[in-house]
Amino acid sequence: NRATQALRQPGSAFKPFVYALALENKFTPSTLVLDAPVVLDQGEDLKMWKPENYGKKFYGPSTIRTGLEKSRNLMTVRVAQEIGIDKLASFAKNLKIYDNPEELLSISLGSAETTLLKLTSAYSSFVNGGKLIEPIFLDRIQDSEGNTIFNSEKRVCEKCKEISYLGDDVPKIKDKFKKVFSEETAYQITSMLEGVIKRGTGK
């Protein structure tokens, strides 16, 4: 099953998570980051790593909003380097994109492999206020008599089962979804992704 089993490099589709972590670490969409050549030592007997932007151009100081909208590789690497690759790897693991990601700066450009299911599940957090919504394949299972023996619903409606309710408060629905980042970050990244379509690489 290519959606659940096939491993693929997400490439630039991973970048929103780099910028989400940046926003969680005191960056703002208007924070300036230098879009300029980066040369990194990979270790003994290995060539220097020189990531490049598409088109092999660079544009100087730019906002991280622009960095995401235009999918700038050099800016993304610099952001990941400033935040710390250990934090980025841990963040990606918490989002369940990767099980045990290597702490390499190249993962900021989506070099590590994952499945489409894991990636789309992580994307759901942007439109759900920073909560990770794990996909389900079975909604519920009932026996021959209509009794529910399995229900995937993770939300709980308080006081919904009461026969009569005379209080002033309306019943509240609480969920058990994992909070992976703030609602503010979710809102800002969603806005930045809209910019990808309006002004950036998705135009």
Please provide the spans of the model-predicted regions:
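A penicillin-recognizing enzyme superfamily signal
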Residues: 1-3, 14, 70, 115-203
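Short helix/strand-bridging catalytic loops that position acidic/His residues to coordinate divalent metals
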Residues: 1-8, 106-109
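Alpha-helix initiation/capping motif
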Residues: 3, 7, 56-57, 81, ...
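Short, glycine/proline-biased beta-turn/loop segments that scaffold the active-site neighborhood
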Residues: 5-61, 134-154
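Short glycine/serine/threonine-biased micro-segments
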Residues: 9, 18, 58, 108, ...
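Active-site-adjacent helix/loop patches that line small-molecule binding or acyl-intermediate pockets
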Residues: 33-38, 42, 51-128, 136, ...
